[in-house]
């Protein structure tokens, strides 16, 4: 059993902080002590912009639109994420959550200082993801484990990828 602490870029399964009976899956972008900024749709960690490269647009098969698709690198992890250029950066409906005072919300987005023993999680479909920007930090005791493959995504088999 792999019992290493989550690292930036890892995709983790965790108990949802607002309802621990639910398991969620998101990418770790902030470790305890990090400052995470998502401003004008750009992610920075500890003042350093996350390296990104725009690639081809992603067609949403169930909808009639495309999203910009990027490749990003956090630490040793390279991954793809979607960004809807028409969606606002503003996070209008963030809830009250423990350590919310560690976050500053403005028209450009959010900046948060991750408290000790917690993680900041973001979804790879950035503009359609309810994640730490909305409901706060994930306590270490809520971490279930690291995800390592997509199981039965029948709508888009190409997303399954390969094992490493």
Where are these regions (language model features)?
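Soluble "head" domains of membrane/secretory-pathway proteins
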Residues: 1-164
């Amino acid at each position: 059993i792999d019992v290493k602490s989550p690292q930036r870029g890892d995709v983790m399964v965790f108990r949802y902080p607002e309802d621990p009976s639910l398991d969620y899956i998101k990418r770790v972008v902030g470790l305890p002590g990090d400052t995470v900024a998502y401003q004008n749709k750009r992610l920075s960690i500890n003042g350093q912009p996350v390296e990104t490269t725009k690639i081809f647009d992603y067609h949403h098969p169930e909808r009639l639109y495309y999203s910009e698709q990027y490749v990003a690198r956090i630490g040793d992890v390279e991954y793809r994420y979607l960004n809807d250029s028409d969606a606002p950066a503003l996070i209008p409906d963030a809830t009250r959550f423990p350590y919310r005072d560690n976050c500053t919300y403005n028209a450009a987005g959010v900046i948060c200082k991750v408290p000790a023993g917690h993680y900041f999680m973001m979804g790879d479909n950035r503009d359609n993801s309810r994640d730490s920007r909305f409901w706060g930090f994930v306590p270490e005791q809520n971490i279930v484990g690291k995800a390592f493959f997509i199981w039965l995504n029948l709508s888009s088999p190409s997303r399954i990828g390969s094992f490493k």
